[in-house]
C-alpha cells in the first residue's frame, strides 16, 4: 500500500535545499549566485518542507492547524463526552495522526498535595524545639504529688491543686534603651522616647547582631499566650494580620476598629525580686499575644500523654515533615480517555453509513501498547511536555541499596560563633615591687574584667556523612516499607482508612529496620521492599516533572493537549466526507491523576472539572490533483489502509489469591497457526482498575498502574512456568538445558550449578529472555546492541545481587536478638522511633561481624530484580515445525488441527491478592475500507483469538 504513487510528489511539495530560487526573489537569487565564492548564504533562510506552490484554490488546506468545536457535549459526574463533526472537503485529506484534544479545566489536587520534602516553615529549628509559650500549672505540684497518700491532708491538697499559676518559656533577644510601663524603648524622636509598636514590635527576626553582646540590661521578645495551642517551632506558621507582619488575632475594639490584643508582661531577675524591695526594675518585657497557629506541612510524631490544653509536657512534643506527595496527570495522559471499556466509548463513523470504526475489546492494551511504541521509536528519558510524556522512573539507589558505608575518617566539628566560649573573667596583675614572689593588681591600663578561655577551644562533633546517609535511608526506604512494619505513634490522632494520606503520613517505622549498618558492604534490596511498588515514590522523576508542569499549588487551571492512541484511528487518512467523531474523558481522579504515595484521591478531596474540549487537526498540504489522485486510489479496496497494533496481543488476567503459589490456566482448543508467543508478569489487585466500568467504586488507589503504564515490578516472584499442549509431542523440544514443557525461572537450591550471574536466575531462562528480546541465543553471550536495548527490555532491567548473612545453624553462639533489644549507636539515636536521642553510649550488640579475623560463619543469599519488562517466551508461528528436535527433523504438530493449551505458573506467595497478567501475542490488525464518500468500514483481525467487525 505504501507505494510512491500515494506519497506527495516532490514536484508539488518540495524540500527547499541548496536551490532556494522557488521562494526567494530573483534579485536575491542572482546576488547569491554572484557572491557564492566569497559570501555563503548557506541556511540563512528557512529550510522547511513547504506547501504546494500551485493548484491550490483555498487557504483551508494551507493552514497549519484547524480547530473543531464540539457540536455536542455531555458532562456527567464521572465523565465528559465531546462530539465533533469532521467535514473533509473535496480534494483534501485529513491527517488523523496529527489530531489532538485541547482540554481546559480546573484541577484541585486536594489537601494531600505536597510537592516538596521537609517543611517551608522554620526548617532550621530542632524538631522538638517549642515556640515561646505559656501554660497553667499547679503552684505546688511537687508537694501535691508527695502528699497524695496522706489522707489527713486531703482537703489541703485539693485546695492547693486549684491554685493554677501561669508559667512562661520564652526568649527576649531584642536589646532596648529602657523599659517602662509603655514597654521597651527602641529610640528617641527629638526629646520624646519612642516605644515599640506592640502590634508587631519587637519583631522576632531582630536581636543582637554581634556574638559578643552578652550583657543585655533591657530586653524584649514576643510570647504566645496560654490560649494559643502549643506546637513545635519546626513547621509552625501563623498568618500576618497587619502590613508590618504582626500576627496577633484581630479583636474588635470599643471604637469599632480591629486590632490585635497584645499584652505586656514585665519580668525582673529572681534575685532582685527575692527581697521584695521598692527599687525593682524590670529586665525583660514579653509581648504576649494569641495567633492563628497552624502547621501546613508538618505533623506531630511524638506526643506526650497530657490532658486538654497547654502544659509543661507539651514542650517535649516532636514534629515531623509531612511526606511529599506529588500529584499530576499520568504519563501520556494515561487513564484520561476511555479505552478498553464496554459500550464503545469512542466513535468514528461516516455520517452516510453510521458504522462505528472503533471496535473495543476488553483486552485491547491500548495504553500499554502506546508506551512500548514510544520506547521503540524514541528515548523515553527525554521528556516531551506537550503530550505530558515523562516516563515513570525510580532512583536505582533506592530500589537496590549499595551500602558501601560512609567516608568519615576525619571528625567534623562545630564551634561557637566567636570561636571561644566558657571564658573566665580575670583581672590583670603584676609582680609586687621589691618582693620575689608577691603579686598585686594592675589597674593602671587594664580593665578589671577580662574574658579569657583556659584550655582548647570548646567544640561539638557530628558525623555529617553518617547522619546524611542514615537520613537518606529513613526518608527514601524506611518510610516506604509495608504498612505491617509500621506503627501509629501514641496520643496522635490518625485516620482509620489505610488508603488515606492522613494514615500513610502519620505512620512511623523504627529506624533500626533500615539503618546505616544494615547489609553494610552489600548491594542488596531489602526483602520487604521487593514487592512494594518502587514507582510510588517521591524520587519518581517523571511524576515529579509532570507535577511541576502544573505548578506548585493545590488549585490549577490547566490547559492540556491529549493525543489519540487507539491504533485503528491514530494513523488514519480521512478522505473527503462528513464524519462523526466522539470520545469520553474520565473525571475519576484516581484514574486520571497519579500521586507518589498512591493514596485514595477521591476520599482525600481531589477533583477535576473540564471547561472545554476542542479538537485540533491538520490537512495534508497537497495540491488538489495530488489529493484527488490519492483519494481515488484509497477508494479501491486493494489499497485499503491496514494498521497493526504495536503490542498485538490479547491480554488475560487470572486472579492469584493471597499466599497462593500455583496458578493453572487453560485455553480451549483452537488453531495456533498465527501465534507468536507469550508475555507475562504479575500485578497487584489493588493497583489494577476494572476497565470495563466507567467508574470503579472499589478502586481506592492513585499510584502507578502497571497494567496501563508498564511499571511492572513483580517479575522476580515467578519460579516456574509449565506449558503443555494436548498432543504427545514435547514442546518446545530438547534444545534447552532443562526439561521440555517446563521453564524454570529461578532456583533457590542450585546443586547442578544451573544459575547465572551470581544470582538465582537459571541460565535457561536468561537465554530465553535474550532470544525473545534481542535474538541472542545460539550465538553465545554478549551485550545486545544499544538500539535494541530499550527501556522496557530485559537486559537493561536485569539486576542480580548477592549478600552474606550469619549462618544461624553453623555458628554456635548465634542469638536471635529481636529489634526491641538490638542496640547500635545507643545514646545517640532515638529508641525505635524517629524521635529525640536517648540512652547511653555502649558497645553495639548488632549486627554480627562478617569480615575481619573474628568473622562469624555465614551463608550466601542470591536474588535478582527485573522491573519494567515483561517475561517473554517466543513461539514459532510455523506450528508445523515445533516440537522435539531429532536427527530426522522436528515432529509435526498438525497445524490444521486445533490444540488446547494448559499452563501452570509457580510463584512466590504474597500476602495480598494479585493477578497473573498474560499477553498472548497474536496478529492484531485493522483494515479500513472507504468505498464511498462518508462511509468508513473496519474489520479487526486477531488471529488466533478473536475478530471484530464494524460492517455488520
Curated annotation (Swiss-Prot):
The modification Phosphoserine is found at residue 175. The modification N-acetylalanine is found at residue 2. The record marks 777 as: Involved in interaction with pre-protein VI. One of its GO terms (cellular component) is viral capsid. Residues 149-172 are annotated as: Disordered. The modification Phosphotyrosine is found at residue 940. InterPro entries: Adenovirus_Pll_hexon_C, Adenovirus_Pll_hexon_N, Adenovirus_Pll_hexon_sub2, ADV_hexon, VP_dsDNA_II. Residues 149-161 have a biased composition (Acidic residues). Its main location: virion. It is found in: Virion; Host nucleus. GO terms for molecular function: structural molecule activity. Induction: Expressed in the late phase of the viral replicative cycle. Pfam families: Adeno_hexon, Adeno_hexon_C. GO terms for biological process: microtubule-dependent intracellular transport of viral material towards nucleus; symbiont entry into host cell. Keywords: Acetylation, Capsid protein, Cytoplasmic inwards viral transport, Host nucleus, Host-virus interaction, Late protein, Microtubular inwards viral transport, Phosphoprotein, T=25 icosahedral capsid protein, Virion, Virus entry into host cell. Major capsid protein that self-associates to form 240 hexon trimers, each in the shape of a hexagon, building most of the pseudo T=25 capsid. Assembled into trimeric units with the help of the chaperone shutoff protein. Transported by pre-protein VI to the nucleus where it associates with other structural proteins to form an empty capsid. Might be involved, through its interaction with host dyneins, in the intracellular microtubule-dependent transport of incoming viral capsid to the nucleus. Homotrimer. Interacts with the capsid vertex protein; this interaction binds the peripentonal hexons to the neighboring penton base. Interacts with the hexon-linking protein; this interaction tethers the hexons surrounding the penton to those situated in the central plate of the facet. Interacts with the hexon-interlacing protein; this interaction lashes the hexons together. Interacts with host dyneins DYNC1LI1 and DYNC1I2; this interaction might be involved in intracellular microtubule-dependent transport of incoming viral capsid. All late proteins expressed from the major late promoter are produced by alternative splicing and alternative polyadenylation of the same gene giving rise to non-overlapping ORFs. A leader sequence is present in the N-terminus of all these mRNAs and is recognized by the viral shutoff protein to provide expression although conventional translation via ribosome scanning from the cap has been shut off in the host cell. Belongs to the adenoviridae hexon protein family. This is Hexon protein. It comes from Human adenovirus C serotype 5.
